[in-house]
């Protein structure tokens, strides 16, 4: 009796018969034999000391989770069928790059934004690949996250975080003019994101404008305070201060473009010019460089020709006028940097930083306790926590943990050093020089646990996944979602080859460690990890951390 098919509602359902079950069992047996044969071949590694192998400081993982501290392992091309995993709800925006849609993840019922980019040429294809690789390495609370992407012969489909407050352009259109305190809160976040881009990744965004700043919520500290995130790195560029940065064509949006970009010789300061334009618009309600036509506008931009309305000058603070002037200096060498902008007196007028990083002392203590208790049992646990945290920005506790991270990361570069951690503990918890030794001891212990990739600092998501209340990670649907990511062929089980692909294991020592990991979870010894085996393993680990 052979296998047969039947069609129901345009979907093919495979009817498994006895012959198929026998064939499947035979294939499984061959797979298992291959896996365990490989284990025998590399078992000798345990018996021979490796003189060149030096265990990494603070790491209990048998092989590195990531190669460079980025998120290559959890942000990947989804090889499944887009329509089977996402429901397209409605269009959100359209531009020269393509379209953006609101979509819903069918398994976890969470809304996402989907950016659809046509593949028009080989050059466009390579540019999209560059954008994806770039987004994989960006980890900042004020930059929208990339979750995964699909690709076919005609288009890329980038699945990103969805912020339901719309973009800043629409908010400006509805409000017309913002108070200085509200403008300060918005600009504080944009400058923080740019410090991270400019100093940590040597990255110029090149298209800072209200349409590329999205609102993800109103801050509870005040009804006129909006939490925002930066989007669209499609024309961004890595820069080198020692080299001339130029482009074959002028890119950016007319009203926000810096004069040096028009001369095709620019650096990261072109983003600061755009910020000056946005700040002007927020508090005045019009563009600083208006004109009767495009040439008139470009002429005013090149000469930095703008004025403040008399009504604004009468009521505006000297600090905001000065910051706008500092951002709109024609000479980029004289223009303020993102770091200096964030330290400008304007932001001290309204306690902007205090609003942005505010959390209760009880939450701060709870976070530190979670950090101290954090323990990594195996790579699969760490990858699971990383995947859940990265894909769940809507969880309120994650937002609060981002604030705690910002409290400690004083230079706002998105990389918490051991010294910053120690100073933060001293300032917010130990509160006194007599406790310096205790703060240093605690900072060392926490830092060595969290810096698993040994790059010398703690990134935001490393901090969040260690500090989060682990009860939030026990949800069966959330763990099913993560299991589905690991189960690349969607057959309901995780194989050795799938783990090898996820962890990018390429040497024989790491293959042995990976095989040991699989065998420690594979209770029925079938060479695969079922969801129940994975789920029970994760529950046991999470319960031990609560």
Language-model-derived ranges and their functions:
Residues 111, 116-138:
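Conserved N-lobe beta3->alphaC-helix segment of eukaryotic protein kinase catalytic domains
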Residues 154-167, 171:
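Conserved short submotifs of the Hanks-type protein kinase catalytic core
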